[in-house]
């Protein structure tokens, strides 16, 4: 990300860090112009910048993590695919006359192994977001996803899904086309697939839109991603009739990776580089790639029957609690 882009998309809590880094760059440029050695001073400031970065990103509130998950420069599904796949060939269409650009998928090679990868795709700017419907998939998108997963099952390829959506498309047309049925069908059929399934929340995991490609043997979540039954804004509007109370809603909804790991909903948190994925996208992709390869190796050691049984048990246990 360029300096101008970073300034444009700067979040409030990132400003102290950005100002310090800008000062470091300014000192470095002045030193080069005047042929002055300030390496010791710069090293000291860089250590302070790293300390500040750790301090900021280790104490984020749920609403701040939501801002990171929605960051315009956060890596998308296609960004991760292009970074981690040795080969990639996109497949199109639901075989029912529709090809939803909000949900992409295809065949790839990951760590030398053939896999099928699919996920929701947001846009980079307003025009692209409109074309991608802001990552909100239609019924045709979920049917395309199921077609690709059935194909992966036929050819014994592990399935990787990337979840990044505020929710499934909720328009009248989507309801006419069977949005609820399409998501429910995917939920049922993903429990029946023989191959390993790894689902990863890479950004925003919203409601049924996330669930439609979210049934797997392992549910991973990037450190600063969020996973939620409803957006905090919607929750605040419903409960308190005031969207300004979304920070309180974000806290109550338990949307962060650490909360969801503690609750047993996700299986593993994938760490992000210092400063979050949008600041170092390639490093974030490498961390995710290794986790995916290791998880596929682990799941491949199980039989299809074992995977299906454990997958079913995993989701049956979600929400179980004991009262003293």
Swiss-Prot record:
Pfam families: ACCA. InterPro entries: Acetyl_CoA_COase_a_su, ClpP/crotonase-like_dom_sf, COA_CT_C. Its EC number is 2.1.3.15. The keyword ATP-binding applies. The keyword Cytoplasm applies. Pathway: Lipid metabolism; malonyl-CoA biosynthesis; malonyl-CoA from acetyl-CoA: step 1/1. PROSITE patterns: COA_CT_CTER (PS50989). GO terms for molecular function: acetyl-CoA carboxylase activity; ATP binding; carboxyl- or carbamoyltransferase activity. It catalyses: N(6)-carboxybiotinyl-L-lysyl-[protein] + acetyl-CoA = N(6)-biotinyl-L-lysyl-[protein] + malonyl-CoA. Its main location: cytoplasm. It comes from the Bacteria. It is an enzyme of class 2 (transferase). It is found in: Cytoplasm. NCBIfam families: accA, AccA_sub, PRK05724.1. Acetyl-CoA carboxylase is a heterohexamer composed of biotin carboxyl carrier protein (AccB), biotin carboxylase (AccC) and two subunits each of ACCase subunit alpha (AccA) and ACCase subunit beta (AccD). Belongs to the AccA family. This is Acetyl-coenzyme A carboxylase carboxyl transferase subunit alpha. It comes from Rippkaea orientalis (strain PCC 8801 / RF-1). The lineage of its organism: Bacteria, Bacillati, Cyanobacteriota, Cyanophyceae, Oscillatoriophycideae. The gene is accA.
